């Protein structure tokens, strides 16, 4: 699910190179994650770890977590040891914005803040859009 992340970051870096975008302002990488995949797949942490390297830096990525609180039909308390899936963003001291995923205006507000921060500081930003599964999924307890 998260295998596309390094591909997107590489494409972003290439477009910045070919547009002579040395300030990394013209092309912004945007990654959309599920809550369990963001916290549970190592490729996200690897991308965070490489973000600060000169040859891999894209000027910051905007990460949006679509957090339905039941990733892969697993309750959050069994899926990770931290309270929020977005805690992984603390690795690079990224600001983490939590919002109600069922309130489009709240999500847009967070997105505007994220873009402004990214453009000003050239750092990653994480938006945790918390929602819930409206139709229950069959699971075993």
Each predicted region: which residue ranges?
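A broad detector of short, well-ordered amphipathic alpha-helices
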Residues: 87, 108-112, 139
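Cofactor-binding active-site loop characterized by glycine-rich and histidine/acidic residues
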Residues: 1-96
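Generic hydrophobic alpha-helical segments
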Residues: 14, 121, 140-141
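Conserved small/polar residues in nucleotide/adenosyl-binding loops
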Residues: 133-141
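Conserved phosphate-handling catalytic cores of large alpha/beta enzymes
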Residues: 76-79, 96-126, 131
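Charged, amphipathic alpha-helical interaction segments
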Residues: 52, 116-119, 138-139
